[in-house]
Amino acid sequence: IAHEVNNTTAGITSTLDTVEQALSSEEGMEDICDVMRVCTDRCFSMSRFITRFADVVKIPEPTVAQVQLNELVSMCKRFMEGMCNDRNIILRLECDPEVGQVRLDASLFEQVLVNIIKNAAESIESAGEAAGKQGEITVRTTVPALIEIVDNGPGISKETEAKLFSPFFSTKPNGQGIGLVFIREVLSRHGCAFSLRTYNDGLTRFRILFN
C-alpha cells in the first residue's frame, strides 16, 4: 500500500510542479499557483505519513516540534476547500491571532484535521436537500490552544456518541470505523483532551484542547 501511495503522490507532485512552473509567469495565476503549492505540500506530507505508518505497521509515535497552530489549520482548510465546494458546503476559517505555537507532529495532525473535516462534510451531504439549509463547516482556533470544527449537519444521537471512537463502529453504510479510531489514537498520544457531540443549538462540534 505504501509503495502504491508513494508512487501516486510522486506522479501528482511532479505534474503539479510542471504546471506551476508553466503558469508562474502568467498574469493572474498567483492564486492558482499558491493552491498548487498547498497540494504539493500535502502530497509530501501524505507520503511521509504513509511511509512512517508502514515502517511500524501501526500508527507511528508522534515526532513533535513547535508548530504555529493557525498556520497548520489554515493549510488544512485550503486543502479541503475544493472537496467542500464540490458538495456545495461552505468551509469557514476563524483563527484567533493570539493562538501561538504548540508541540505536535504536523503530519499526523494534518491527517486528523483532514479526517474530521471530511467526516463533517459527509455528514452534511448525507442529509441532502431534506435538511433545507446551506451546509456549513467552521474551523476555529481559540486561546489558549483549542481547535473546534463545527458543522450544521444532521447531528449525532447520544447513543451513537457513546460508540463513536470504538473500533469498527461506523454510521456510514460502507464505513469501516477506522477514521475515528485513528483520530483518537493520535490525539491521545499528543495528550489532547477531545470531544465530539451535538449540542442543544443543533451544531456538532469536534473540540481538541492542547494541554
PLM features: residue spans?
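Core catalytic ATP-binding domain of two-component histidine kinases
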Residues: 1-211
